């Protein structure tokens, strides 16, 4: 497995390392800022991020609860 990728099952927890990049992550909890649903500007609060929302440009802004 590539060290910069990790499994992020839908509805599962994201417990990968800080260097990890989760592709297409749809986690219910995100302990690290690795989840793609947490935009870069929300990295500081991604610790408690809850990934939500659908796909597409409009949904991007609504995906990450830590941005609210």
UniProtKB/Swiss-Prot annotation:
GO terms for molecular function: cadmium ion binding; copper ion binding; metal ion binding; metal ion sequestering activity; protein kinase activator activity; zinc ion binding. A divalent metal cation 4 binds at residues 34-35, 45, 49. A divalent metal cation 1 binds at residues 6, 8, 22, 25. A divalent metal cation 6 binds at residues 38, 42, 45, 67. Signal peptide: none annotated. Disulfide bonds: none annotated. Residues 31-68 are annotated as: Alpha. One of its GO terms (cellular component) is nucleus. Belongs to the metallothionein superfamily. Type 1 family. A divalent metal cation 2 binds at residues 8, 14, 16, 27. PANTHER family: METALLOTHIONEIN (PTHR23299), METALLOTHIONEIN-3 (PTHR23299:SF18). A divalent metal cation 5 binds at residues 35, 37-38, 51. A divalent metal cation 7 binds at residues 51, 64, 66-67. InterPro entries: Metalthion_dom_sf, Metalthion_dom_sf_vert, Metalthion_vert, Metalthion_vert_metal_BS. The modification N-acetylmethionine is found at residue 1. Brain. The modification Phosphoserine is found at residue 33. Binds heavy metals. Contains three zinc and three copper atoms per polypeptide chain and only a negligible amount of cadmium. Pfam families: Metallothio. It comes from Equus caballus. Residues 1-30 are annotated as: Beta. This is Metallothionein-3. Keywords: Acetylation, Copper, Metal-binding, Metal-thiolate cluster, Phosphoprotein, Zinc.
């Amino acid at each position: 497995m590539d060290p910069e990728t990790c499994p992020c099952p839908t509805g599962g927890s994201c417990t990968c390392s800080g260097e990890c990049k989760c592709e297409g992550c749809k986690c219910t909890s995100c302990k690290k800022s690795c989840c793609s649903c947490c935009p870069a500007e929300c990295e500081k609060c991604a610790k408690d991020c809850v990934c939500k929302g659908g796909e597409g440009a409009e949904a991007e802004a609504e995906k990450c609860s830590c941005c609210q």
